[in-house]
Amino acid sequence: CYAGLYKRREGGLLMASKIVLSGYYGFNNLGDEAVLYSILRTLRTSKPDLKITVLSGDPAQTKKLYNVEAVNRWKLQEVFKALRQCDLLISGGGSLLQDVTSSTSLVYYLGVVWLAKLLKKKVIYYAQGIGPITSWVGQKLVPLVSNKVDVITVRDQESKNLLQKLEVKIPAIYVKADPVLGLYNREIERKSGQDLL
């Protein structure tokens, strides 16, 4: 499981008390909100006293829905403050590192990671779906930034292959299930258990 992986890493979840989550959150996208819910559930199950801050397009809504701290992802001063005060940045899940829909979004997510590393914070890619990455800029920036990340998990072998093709080689890359799939599987297990009663 994800929590077990991070606990085994020095300076990872076991050591972190303040975590920042970066993803496509606060835009009323059902899939991405399910990803956020699943990540929060995993983190809180592993360590209930975590202080979690989400970078969100709608901080007020995110605070209300998930009982977390949230800051406006577009306000650099707020993002900087959240990263400066955290122990760990989790980037993901979802398909954040791609430039098909927009190269701007790729630069944004990599920029958040880059800023966290400048502040000497631990960074995890969480169940990322990588690619397509077609632009010259994207193909240069992804390995430049990703080789500074502490732990990388991707949701499929294709994503791992692409990172390796782009020469991301410093952190180990783990293939793990999409967190939403894990949430779905737990729900099936719960219902199956009820049916047996």
Where in this protein do the model-derived segments appear?
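Active-site anion-handling motifs in enzyme catalytic cores
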Residues: 1-3, 9-197
